[in-house]
């Protein structure tokens, strides 16, 4: 029966859990949604009475009312209500019995932004956990306002008019209270009586009041207090014995007060202290902050501190941030930051430091961010930051720096942000910058862009350094006079316009003049380009590409070989070419400093030839084998060549594609056309984006899918075979046994590559493994492709689709997968108390409550099981005792020892002689006692043991006697 009951209960629970939850009927101004099996009702501009009448007896879990019209609420007749929030309404009071209907269910109350004058009497709300009465007009608290709220853990009374607390107003909830927020009121002293002995209080906010001092013993016996906020008061003094038995304090916020002295020795009692903020006070000296093993952040901004003493922060092994900005610091003693191995941020901005002394920043070997902004520094040398090898951000803006010695930044290999804005820098000495720094901010300086500035300009271009932020004005030169007002990034292009001869020399046209301008020194690696050798741009790959690809361009001055060469030769200035040189300057400088051509450079170079008319008879005769792959990709992507309209260029592209198709078809048929290498360039001359497009099945411009397929088949046979040996030439179009590298697995690889990726960068071992259907070794891939797969890890699965079919073990697959190392974080995330919202605390409490329910359920089940075992044991023992009792009632005498009469003996003797029968002892002669009678009435006459045989004759004989 008991098992049937348990089964029935289980079925009932399953039925209830599977029942569909639906929203009830609601007023027009309300909205209903279901979240996490809870019915949430939100209303705007509605009163409680109307909502209750519409909802009726239906259950709702949460009720949110915005802009409500109630002035007084008489009743809350809602079934199952757990959360109520009345926001920005006109509510002034509650009836004493208003909460009676929800006493057993209500958990969270928020009455924020209303007109309450006093804390309502809530009654016996034994399940209430949080109460938020922020932003009302509460000025008084009844003595028994919180009686009956035995489970209350959070009480928020922020932004009211509370000037004092009755001594016993929080006695009913003191034992359970975890968070108390009374900030933004008019308290003039610590409410010690309501706080003392709050055994579970963890968060206390007394900010934005009128508290002037913390007296002795006012914060006493708070064993679990973790965070104390007394910011934005009129606090002048903290007495020596103010804190007693507050061992767990971690966060202490005292900013925006008028504290003039702070005894650091008293702070040493807080061994768990992590954050100390005494910003914007009146401290004349930095408090001694030593021997705080868990201290992570110290903020002493906005005080009157003039000096940081030696070992000011000693024995703080976990300190990560120090901020002493907005003080009057003129000196930082040597070893002030000794042994701060975990310090990553040091902010010393807005002080009066005039010089960085040797050893000033020693002891911070892992420092990453340093700000010395808005001081009075004038010079930097190699010893300034020598110990800061891990520095990534250095802010030196708004100083008076005019001299930076060579080697100042040599040891800062990880530096990527250097702010030198608003200083007195006019230029840089030789080799000041050797390693790449991605961002060097220079706005607000008086840069003199003379010849001594050339090396720095070359450094900026070669390393693609950003010199200003998007919202800042661009950097301008302030001298010499002919360069005044020239943008830094336009300087090289503007210099090209000053002399046509120098610009022509950059394009490979030798000039009779041997003049050297500023622009020539920008490009030392180009040097004199010598004679044209038949093509004006032969010494410059990009110009050579244009002139060899489009022969008609050679007729343009500066490009072709028809310009007179030799002594006395003269060239007529060409305005179009002058304008073009300015656009050419940017890409050419990058090439001159060791960079490789990229698509953006080609596009800039081509688009920088305004007003150049291209008259090209027979333009369609294009030699693709001499054309740069990037140029081909540029045109196929829709790029335009100045002087050629789009329709003409599209026609040329279509004609070229048709010629490619014709030549490929002829080659596959075994009849290659003459000069096919001009229209069918080798694979290394084709842009990788075009190869990927074709192999992915996308048609080429001007061709259909079948025509594109023929070109694909031609290039397929030009690819290396599976073993790295070039495939044999195709003898006939019908040959289907040729070695085809682009099998389905290879197509899958192409689809995973980034658009336009250069296939030549993929190792042949990987390609060969893919074409054979094997698992490739992904560790051999280049870094840029591994980074792409890191961002698209799902695409890696298709690489191993055939692994199962080939019986490849998981260990072999894992061995060939790349290892993505998690990057080291550059900084840490500071603690922010503002993230401690009521929802977070409530969520923690809800998780804790669920965990407790599970524990209680487990204990209850264990108890039931234990009781069941005890009952079974008791029943077994009882049964055994009954059996023993029955056996004890049996007469256990034998014939030789019986006390029977002679007649009985004779009868026994006669029966023995008459017929053999088993000997059966007579019944015991038990006297009739009250106990025996009771036992007899319960169990009947005592019987023999069931193992003995009953003799019918003996029974009848006894019955006659």
Swiss-Prot record:
PROSITE patterns cross-referenced by the UniProt entry: LRR
Extracellular side: 19-854
Tagged with keyword Transferase: no
Transmembrane segment boundaries: 855-875
Regions of compositional bias (Low complexity) in chain numbering: 893-902
Knockout or disruption consequences: Lethal at early L1 larval stage due to excretory defects. Maternal copy required for survival.
Secretion signal, residue range per the UniProt entry: 1-18
Compartments in which it is found: Apical cell membrane
Cytoplasmic side of membrane: 876-961
Pfam families: LRR_8
InterPro entries, per the entry: Leu-rich_rpt, Leu-rich_rpt_typical-subtyp, LRR_dom_sf
Biased composition (Polar residues): 928-943
Cellular component aspect of the GO annotation: apical plasma membrane
Membrane topology recorded in Swiss-Prot or TrEMBL: Single-pass type I membrane protein
Origin superkingdom: Eukaryota
Annotated LRR repeat ranges: 60-78, 79-101, 103-124, 125-148, 150-172, 174-197, 199-222, 223-245, 247-269, 270-294, 305-316, 317-339, 340-363, 364-387, 388-411, 413-435, 437-455
Main location per the UniProt record: membrane
Renumbered residue ranges of the record's region Disordered: 890-943
Keyword Protein biosynthesis: no
Tissue: In L1 larvae, expressed in a subset of epithelial cells including epidermal, vulval and rectal cells and the excretory duct and pore. Also detected in some neurons. Absent from internal epithelia such as the gut and pharyngeal tubes.
Keywords, comma-separated and alphabetical: Cell membrane, Leucine-rich repeat, Membrane, Repeat, Signal, Transmembrane, Transmembrane helix
Described function: Required for apical extracellular matrix organization and epithelial junction maintenance.
The protein's name: Leucine-rich repeat-containing protein egg-6
Organism: Caenorhabditis elegans
Taxonomic placement: Eukaryota, Metazoa, Ecdysozoa, Nematoda, Chromadorea
């Amino acid at each position: 029966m008991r098992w049937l009951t348990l089964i029935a209960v289980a079925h009932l629970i399953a039925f209830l859990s599977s029942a569909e939850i639906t929203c009830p009927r609601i007023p027009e101004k309300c909205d209903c949604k279901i979240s996490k099996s809870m019915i949430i009702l939100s209303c705007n501009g509605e009163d409680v009475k109307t909502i209750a009448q519409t909802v009726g007896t239906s259950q709702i879990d949460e009720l949110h009312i915005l802009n409500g019209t109630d002035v007084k609420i008489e009743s809350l007749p809602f079934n199952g209500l757990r959360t109520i929030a009345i926001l920005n309404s006109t509510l002034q009071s509650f009836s004493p019995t208003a909460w009676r209907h929800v006493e057993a269910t209500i958990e969270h109350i928020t009455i924020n932004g209303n007109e309450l004058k006093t804390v309502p009497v809530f009654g016996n709300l034994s399940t209430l956990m949080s109460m938020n009465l922020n932003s009302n007009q509460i000025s008084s608290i009844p003595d028994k306002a919180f009686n009956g709220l035995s489970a209350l853990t959070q009480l928020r009374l922020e932004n009211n008019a509370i000037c004092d607390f009755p001594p016993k107003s929080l006695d009913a909830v003191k034992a359970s209270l975890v968070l108390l927020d009374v900030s933004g009121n008019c308290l003039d002293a610590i409410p010690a009586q309501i706080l003392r002995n709050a055994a579970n209080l963890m968060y206390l906010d007394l900010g934005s009041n009128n508290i002037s001092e913390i007296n002795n013993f006012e914060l006493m016996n708070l064993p679990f207090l973790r965070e104390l906020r007394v910011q934005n008061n009129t606090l002048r003094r903290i007495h020596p014995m103010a804190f007693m038995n507050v061992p767990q304090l971690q966060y202490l916020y005292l900013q925006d007060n008028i504290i003039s002295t702070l005894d650091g020795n008293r702070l040493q009692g807080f061994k768990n202290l992590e954050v100390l903020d005494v910003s914007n006070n009146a401290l004349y000296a930095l408090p001694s902050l030593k021997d705080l093993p868990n201290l992570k952040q110290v903020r002493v901004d906005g005080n009157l501190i003039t000096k940081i003493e030696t070992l000011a922060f000693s024995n703080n092994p976990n300190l990560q941030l120090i901020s002493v900005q907005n003080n009057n610091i003129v000196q930082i003693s040597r070893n002030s930051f000794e042994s701060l191995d975990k310090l990553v941020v040091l902010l010393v901005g807005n002080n009066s430091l005039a010089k960085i002394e040797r050893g000033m920043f020693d002891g911070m070997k892992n420092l990453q961010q340093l700000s010395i902004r808005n001081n009075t520094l004038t010079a930097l040398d190699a010893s300034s930051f020598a110990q800061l090898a891990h520095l990534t951000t250095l802010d030196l803006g708004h100083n008076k720096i005019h001299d930076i010695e060579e080697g100042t930044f040599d040891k800062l290999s990880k530096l990527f942000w250097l702010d030198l804005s608003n200083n007195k820098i006019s230029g840089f000495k030789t080799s000041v910058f050797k390693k790449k720094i991605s961002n060097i901010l220079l706005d607000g300086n008086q840069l003199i862009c003379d010849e001594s500035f050339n090396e720095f300009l070359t450094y900026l271009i070669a390393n693609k350094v950003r010199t200003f932020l998007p919202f800042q004005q661009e950097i301008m030169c302030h001298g010499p006079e002919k360069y005044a007002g020239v943008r830094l990034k336009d300087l090289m292009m503007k210099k090209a316009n000053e002399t046509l001869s120098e610009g022509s020399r950059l394009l490979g046209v030798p000039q009779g003049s041997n003049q050297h301008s500023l622009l020539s020194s920008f490009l030392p690696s180009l040097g004199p380009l010598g004679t044209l050798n038949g093509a004006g741009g032969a010494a410059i790959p990009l110009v050579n590409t244009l002139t060899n690809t489009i022969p008609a361009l050679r007729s343009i001055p500066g490009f072709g070989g028809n310009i007179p060469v030799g002594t006395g030769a003269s060239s007529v200035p060409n305005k179009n070419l002058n304008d073009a040189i300015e656009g050419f300057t940017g890409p050419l400088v990058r090439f001159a400093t060791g960079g490789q051509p990229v698509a953006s450079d080609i596009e800039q170079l081509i688009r920088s030839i305004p007003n150049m008319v291209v008259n090209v008879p027979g333009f369609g005769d294009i030699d693709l084998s001499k054309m740069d792959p990037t140029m081909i990709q540029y045109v196929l992507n829709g790029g335009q060549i100045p002087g050629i309209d789009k329709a003409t260029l599209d026609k040329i592209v279509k004609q070229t594609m048709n010629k490619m198709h014709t030549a490929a078809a002829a080659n596959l048929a075994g009849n290659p056309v003459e000069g096919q290498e001009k229209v069918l360039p080798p694979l290394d001359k084709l842009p990788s984006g075009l190869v990927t497009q074709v192999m992915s099945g996308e048609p080429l411009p001007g061709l259909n899918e079948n025509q594109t397929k023929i070109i694909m088949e031609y290039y397929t046979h030009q690819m290396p075979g599976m073993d790295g040996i070039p495939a044999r030439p195709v003898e006939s179009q019908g040959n289907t046994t040729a070695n085809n590298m682009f099998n389905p697995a290879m197509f899958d690889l192409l689809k995973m590559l980034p658009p336009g990726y250069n296939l030549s960068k993929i190792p042949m071992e990987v390609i060969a493994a893919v074409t054979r259907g094997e698992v490739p070794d992904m560790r051999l891939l280049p870094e840029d492709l591994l980074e792409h797969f890191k961002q698209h890890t799902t695409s890696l699965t298709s690489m191993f689709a055939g692994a199962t079919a080939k019986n490849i073990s998981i260990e072999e697959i894992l061995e060939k997968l790349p290892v993505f190392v998690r990057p080291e974080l550059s900084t840490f995330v500071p603690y922010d108390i503002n993230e401690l919202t009521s929802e977070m605390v409530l969520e923690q409490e809800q998780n804790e409550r669920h965990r407790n329910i599970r524990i209680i359920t487990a204990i209850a089940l264990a108890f039931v099981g234990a009781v069941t075992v005890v009952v079974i044991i008791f029943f077994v023992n009882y049964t055994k005792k009954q059996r023993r009792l029955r056996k004890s009632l049996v007469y256990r005498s034998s014939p030789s020892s019986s006390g029977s009469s002679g007649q009985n003996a004779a009868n026994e003797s006669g029966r023995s002689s008459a017929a053999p029968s088993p000997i059966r002892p007579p019944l015991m002669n038990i006297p009739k006692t009250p106990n025996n009678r009771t036992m007899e009435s319960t169990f009947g006459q005592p019987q023999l043991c069931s193992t003995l045989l009953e003799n019918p004759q003996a029974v009848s004989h006894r019955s006659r006697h």
